[in-house]
Amino acid sequence: MSNHSDQIVKKYILNQSFVESSFFTKLSELKLEKYKLDSSYIAIHGFQTHPTKLNKFNDTPVLNLDQSSFDDTLNDSRINIPGELFNVNTIEEFKSLDKLKLLNTWGQNVYSEVTNATSFDYKLFNKFYILTYSDLKKYKFYYWVAYPTLSNTWTVESESQETDTTITQLVETELDNEYGQFFQYYGGKLHKSVQADKEHTFVFIDTCLSKDRKPSSQLKNYLYFIAYKGIKEIDLVTYRNNNLSFTQHLKLDAFTDSPKISGWERTNQGKLGPKLADLGSLINPLQLAEQAVELNLKLMKWRIAPDIDLEIIKKQKVLLLGAGTLGSYVARALLGWGVRSITFVDSGRISFSNPVRQPLFNFEDCFSDSGQGEYKALRAAENLKRVFPGVDAKGICLAVPMVGHPVTDEHKERENYETLVKLFEEHDVIFLLMDSRESRWLPTLIGAANEKIVINAALGFDSYLVMRHGVTNQKDRLGCYYCNDVVAPNDSLSDRTLDQMCTVTRPGGALMASSLAVELLVAILQHPERNLAPHDAETKFGNIPHQIRGFLHNFQQTKLFAPSYVHCSACSPRVITEFKQEGWEFVRKCLDDSQYLEDISGLTKVQQEAELAAKQLLEDLSLDDDVSNDIDEDSEWLS
């Protein structure tokens, strides 16, 4: 062993962290869905390269963190280092925290574990902490890793590059079996606990291969531990796998029972300070958009609506019948709620008056190769994908067969009917957003027969109606759009003036009706019975009315309930039964002659009875008039 004339204070290589982007991706996911506003300490773990696998590039001890750092199960093939994560909720808190005080608090935890240790368990001596702030909106993550170290000064009395081959062989055997980082050597064996009365030869397995033979700073807590046990002079063998192990004779310079705590990680410039991981430029833009859309929704669960079920909303397959003003606004609102599957059905083309009222269309959409506007359904789906590429949006050009409009091309209309039936089977929710009354009849009937969630939105000039349809097995069944009618819907589109052909409404009404329709759906989905929920049923997210009627002339809104009607032309048991039995044949008869529909539903009989009652009432009133006239004539003689 070569001696130095001057004693040298023992020096170390400071730990560095390597935090992969997957660590922050996992942290953001857990922050949103699990931790929320909870800033309690979270148990995590990092890992280091096994000493037998180090190479010349591993000149610094590195702690690795990735998405697996949050797992409960550990990878036994790696050296797992326990740690704790302290995630604060604001950047102001991150900046204003007293970092020295925080480090001292962590250091006291390490001090307690080290001084009470019964063995050289590396997990007790190497615990780390990480202070973080997650800016989930900008995908920026501020972090600062600390390795609390108990300061104690040792001087190198002498040093040699020669080591006892017996010790190195024992170390290599030990590493093949079970990882340990620090041992006491006596009696020809390596021991995992300290014995002050035995030979003071200790072995440290280094986690870096620095060229100047400075060991990792992980050694410092072990040295403090043996000093705490009263050992003041040792021979230390620092093992390295590249045949560059070395031996030093160390002497304790001074010992204090209240050690100074150090350990904040330095930046790449060698300065004390936190680091910033900006993942915004690294994440795929589509993935960024997906996460950003879900961000606002998941933030609801932090405080405002912790019990809301967002997943059931997201997985709904929604069919929009009508891709005009109502359809455009409903689609945008559904996107905002996280719905990912939307299908538009419409047969119309985009006209020059549409883009200002229908937000899914632009001026350029008013042109196509045929000289007409683009098809609304197709362009609505395309433009919705431009708003959010992650949506599964489809457009289908289809004219819904309408009651009271006789069949002129049976092959085409039957094909449209069959397509519509198939679409109902494939979707969970149907919105009726068309601009005529009779066009809603067939979808109402198919929805009732299939017991789907059907939501209807309709506009007047300065009023609107939003309602949900009842289902057949519902207690106190809710009525549908036609349950208040005593006649079947008929042709309302022919022989109209210009102001009747255009949808003449106050522009704001469409936004209000559309948003209420979507919010009504969300409320339904939060109820355990879904569309079986009664009128004004309560959920953790509010009430579920049957109907909402709004009036813009006095800015009033009313919740209403109307029960189903046994003779309804769209949802009565007799009509549904006939539809299930005959299918297209029944529909064709109704399209050709709305009187047939009235006969089947019983409305004809209701009308006849009403006429008889009215006739009887008139006769009764006429008789009363005759009697009163006689009394007036007799009164002249009695006066």
Swiss-Prot record:
Q: Which compartments does it reside in?
A: Cytoplasm; Preautophagosomal structure
Name the Gene Ontology molecular function terms of this record.
Atg12 activating enzyme activity; Atg8 activating enzyme activity; identical protein binding
Annotated signal sequence range: none
Q: Which UniProt keywords apply?
A: Autophagy, Cytoplasm, Protein transport, Transport, Ubl conjugation pathway
Q: List GO terms (cellular component aspect).
A: cytoplasm; cytosol; extrinsic component of phagophore assembly site membrane; phagophore assembly site
> By its UniProt entry, which Pfam families does this protein fall under?
ATG7_N, ThiF
Residues forming the motif GXGXXG motif are: 322-327
One GO biological process this protein is involved in is:
autophagosome assembly
**Active site per UniProt:** C502 (glycyl thioester intermediate)
Q: How does it assemble?
A: Homodimer.
The record ties this protein, via NCBIfam families, to: E1_like_apg7
> What is the documented function of this protein?
E1-like activating enzyme involved in the 2 ubiquitin-like systems required for cytoplasm to vacuole transport (Cvt) and autophagy. Activates ATG12 for its conjugation with ATG5 and ATG8 for its conjugation with phosphatidylethanolamine. Both systems are needed for the ATG8 association to Cvt vesicles and autophagosomes membranes. Autophagy is essential for maintenance of amino acid levels and protein synthesis under nitrogen starvation.
What remark about domains does the record contain? The GxGxxG motif is important for the function, possibly through binding with ATP.
Q: Give the family from UniProt.
A: Belongs to the ATG7 family.
Query: What name is this protein filed under?
Result: Ubiquitin-like modifier-activating enzyme ATG7
| Chain's gene name | APG7
